[in-house]
């Protein structure tokens, strides 16, 4: 898809349901890569399914974890994928080969993981009821400093360029920390009314611009300008650019995100499968997308460069897009569209081989356009894929995964013993089983395991993803024998 040829006028947000992606197992969370060509979906059985979003087909399946995957994050170039599961494990995967490179075991449940937007060797981990942890890949880890009130319900996120980390707690206090020194650059508190504070549930940054949003427990989404926050410094009192909420239903928000260009904000309801879309500049509600009734929303992500939203509910990934209208006049300006059949009247000498009535134009040669050399070798960078501080695209970025055709009836000699390629076994001086052992040994050497020690970390906590499922299973059906029985006195 050539992004330069897409319709850039009119509304830039999805309007209708455009199909679903079935991962066979139940989908829990998802994340787009930077280019929007690959969609990683974390499933309930621990697998990560990577979809080719252009063909809407499965490109790769990684058997990542044993427990459900709760968070995913891509590197900037798309070669690495970060995943966290409900068994307190955080893993870094090579997307091209599907191999595990690094594994971190935490003592407490992990709620969110995120790669540094500009540094593939740095990641942010948010454990449950503990300070956020900044991990250097293959090196050390550091805990982010807490506010003076010592609240441990921390949410954290990198800013767009990875220079600062924004943290928020249950008392509405926001800290802006320098990534290198952990120095508090700015801080402010979200206050409802005159004195009461509200808990911070999530912090999300736009891919373009300096805006970021804070989802709080008072059911209001506040949009701020990061430049203004840093300018005001410590204990500032910034005013939000917009306050977004559902005034009618007082909806609580499960997940919020920006559009690829940062001009729209999407929020998913925590009570039903409904997506609310606002325009950031003026704050008006432009669209509500309704899914199947009775479904609960788990995750929402916006495509990085196109007006497409992916939402997860009932184990399926729902795709929301614009209604595509065919515009044939865009290819032929003189093309005339008809609402009904019309008998065509041939013009005089229209289909003649030689037009006898054509007048001779003496100035035809002079009116011809000058010849222009067209450069077919130089590849111009696509503006949608480049940041404001970049001159061009990353040539080493991974946008697509190679696919191999499945051969139903392979010819003789196509594969060796145990399904191995003949070149791997026949050309070497080893048996097939020795070759398999060599592969397993190299994978073990390549994968590095780390036990992250967090002092006084809560080890008896249950991940919210598991506890919510357990509470649903314990609910008794209405009208059962226990409900119909008489209460004892």
From Swiss-Prot:
Residues 451-489 are annotated as: Disordered. It is found in: Nucleus. One of its GO terms (cellular component) is MLL1/2 complex. Keywords: Chromatin regulator, Nucleus, Repeat, Transcription, Transcription regulation, WD repeat. The keyword Hydrolase does not apply. WD repeats lie at residues 22-63, 64-103, 147-187, 195-234, 248-290, 292-330. One of its GO terms (biological process) is heart development. InterPro entries: RBBP5/Swd1, WD40/YVTN_repeat-like_dom_sf, WD40_repeat_CS, WD40_rpt. The keyword Chaperone does not apply. SUPFAM superfamilies: Nucleoporin domain. Core component of several methyltransferase-containing complexes. Component of the SET1 complex, composed at least of the catalytic subunit Set1, wds/WDR5, Wdr82, Rbbp5, ash2, Cfp1/CXXC1, hcf and Dpy-30L1. Component of the MLL3/4 complex composed at least of the catalytic subunit trr, ash2, Rbbp5, Dpy-30L1, wds, hcf, ptip, Pa1, Utx, Lpt and Ncoa6. Component of the SET1 complex that specifically di- and trimethylates 'Lys-4' of histone H3 and of the MLL3/4 complex which also methylates histone H3 'Lys-4'. This is Retinoblastoma-binding protein 5 homolog. The gene is Rbbp5.
